[in-house]
């Protein structure tokens, strides 16, 4: 049973690694914003965090943001109330803001 669990975890790790989940950051054509943080301190050691937000639904200027609270911290040190507010600020900044982490700054 332990061997099967180890094999499953190793398979999932390899799948994530080779599927492109560890991108360098930026915005792709589907509207997904990726922000990766971390360093590669040595061979075989990987410390990496990946944040993704889908801003595709907020690109329309006719869409207004609600007041729901789900704070996001931007790379500019600003706390945005929710995903919509962050995406609107990202659009206004021409992509210069990145997602630092979820929660208040």
UniProtKB/Swiss-Prot annotation:
<keyword id="KW-0873">Pyrrolidone carboxylic acid</keyword>
<keyword id="KW-1015">Disulfide bond</keyword>
<keyword id="KW-0646">Protease inhibitor</keyword>
<feature type="disulfide bond">
    <location>
        <begin position="55"/>
        <end position="87"/>
    </location>
</feature>
<feature type="domain" description="Kazal-like">
    <location>
        <begin position="49"/>
        <end position="105"/>
    </location>
</feature>
<feature type="site" description="Reactive bond">
    <location>
        <begin position="67"/>
        <end position="68"/>
    </location>
</feature>
<keyword id="KW-0732">Signal</keyword>
<comment type="function">
    <text>Serine protease inhibitor selective for kallikreins. Efficiently inhibits KLK5 and human KLK2, KLK4, KLK5, KLK6, KLK7, KLK12, KLK13 and KLK14. Doesn't inhibit human KLK1 and KLK8.</text>
</comment>
<dbReference type="InterPro" id="IPR001239">
    <property type="entry name" value="Prot_inh_Kazal-m"/>
</dbReference>
<feature type="signal peptide">
    <location>
        <begin position="1"/>
        <end position="23"/>
    </location>
</feature>
<dbReference type="InterPro" id="IPR036058">
    <property type="entry name" value="Kazal_dom_sf"/>
</dbReference>
<dbReference type="InterPro" id="IPR002350">
    <property type="entry name" value="Kazal_dom"/>
</dbReference>
<protein>
    <recommendedName>
        <fullName>Serine protease inhibitor Kazal-type 6</fullName>
    </recommendedName>
</protein>
<dbReference type="GO" id="GO:0005576">
    <property type="term" value="C:extracellular region"/>
</dbReference>
<dbReference type="Pfam" id="PF00050">
    <property type="entry name" value="Kazal_1"/>
</dbReference>
<keyword id="KW-0722">Serine protease inhibitor</keyword>
<feature type="disulfide bond">
    <location>
        <begin position="73"/>
        <end position="105"/>
    </location>
</feature>
<dbReference type="InterPro" id="IPR050159">
    <property type="entry name" value="Kazal-type_SerProtInhib"/>
</dbReference>
<feature type="modified residue" description="Pyrrolidone carboxylic acid">
    <location>
        <position position="24"/>
    </location>
</feature>
<keyword id="KW-0964">Secreted</keyword>
<feature type="disulfide bond">
    <location>
        <begin position="65"/>
        <end position="84"/>
    </location>
</feature>
<dbReference type="GO" id="GO:0004867">
    <property type="term" value="F:serine-type endopeptidase inhibitor activity"/>
</dbReference>
């Amino acid at each position: 049973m332990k061997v099967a669990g180890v094999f499953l975890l190793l398979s999932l790790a390899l799948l994530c690694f080779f599927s492109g989940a560890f991108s360098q950051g930026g915005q792709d054509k589907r509207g997904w914003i990726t922000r990766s943080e971390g360093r590669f301190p040595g061979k075989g050691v990987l410390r990496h965090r990946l944040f993704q937000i889908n801003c595709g639904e907020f690109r329309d200027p006719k869409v207004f943001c609600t007041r729901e609270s789900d704070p996001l911290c931007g790379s500019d040190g600003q706390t945005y109330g929710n995903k919509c507010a962050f995406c609107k600020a990202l659009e206004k900044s021409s992509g210069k803001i990145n997602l630092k982490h979820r929660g208040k700054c």
